[in-house]
Amino acid sequence: MEWTETQFDRQRREMVDSLRRNGIQNPWVLEAFQEVRRHLFVPEEGRAHAYDDAAWPIGYGQTISQPFTVAYMTSLLADHVPGGSGRPFGRVLEIGTGSGYQAAILEAIGYSVFSVERLPVLYHQAKAKFHRFGLPITCRLGDGTLGWPEEAPFDGILVSAGAPSEPKALKEQLAENGSMVIPVGNRGMQVMTLVTRKGARFEREQYQNFAFVPLVGREGWDDKNTLLY
């Protein structure tokens, strides 16, 4: 069955309504989810289910996270970076470009987005999508656990994979009062954590439990079976 843009538009509105019913209230986040066409970031075979609240495999052991998870993380970031009631702005680093959907959501909100992906195929696919859709997102291939020191500091960092601990390199790349949203825990379950820089100190708040693919890299999980570059 060939889906039309009208059908996708209706499904996207229903997805946003569902997010709102499930507690996502940030207006800028909801607006971005209405604007960004998620079906363009899902593999062809999954497009009919692009607006279901479910993760979908994108290859190489990676997934595009379910909409609620993306909205939850994005809301945490948007509520704290830069803070206040106006439209969010600032420089945000995303770790784990994956399908490119999370980066597109951040860009739609109003952030200047930098994104690091460790898997070459996913990096090139996402970069091509950003170019095709005219999205001014800067991305690079590399070890996301080390961040992007040449572009630091960042007002916000969003980590789209589960970490065993908070990577020191990422914390050091936060601007003063900047915040990082990162799932921290074991390989099976992580606690969504908000880390905020206050001078030489880092304050933490913990939220709901989630299950992410592992954050692989020098300051993350070791995975010798995965090609990094």
UniProtKB/Swiss-Prot annotation:
This is Protein-L-isoaspartate O-methyltransferase. The active site is at 65. GO terms for molecular function: protein-L-isoaspartate (D-aspartate) O-methyltransferase activity. The lineage of its organism: Bacteria, Pseudomonadati, Chlorobiota, Chlorobiia, Chlorobiales. Keywords: Cytoplasm, Methyltransferase, S-adenosyl-L-methionine, Transferase. It comes from Chlorobium phaeovibrioides (strain DSM 265 / 1930) (Prosthecochloris vibrioformis (strain DSM 265)). Its EC number is 2.1.1.77. GO terms for biological process: methylation; protein modification process; protein repair. It is found in: Cytoplasm. It comes from the Bacteria. PROSITE patterns: PCMT. Its main location: cytoplasm. It catalyses: [protein]-L-isoaspartate + S-adenosyl-L-methionine = [protein]-L-isoaspartate alpha-methyl ester + S-adenosyl-L-homocysteine. It is an enzyme of class 2 (transferase). Catalyzes the methyl esterification of L-isoaspartyl residues in peptides and proteins that result from spontaneous decomposition of normal L-aspartyl and L-asparaginyl residues. It plays a role in the repair and/or degradation of damaged proteins. Belongs to the methyltransferase superfamily. L-isoaspartyl/D-aspartyl protein methyltransferase family. GO terms for cellular component: cytoplasm. Disulfide bonds: none annotated.
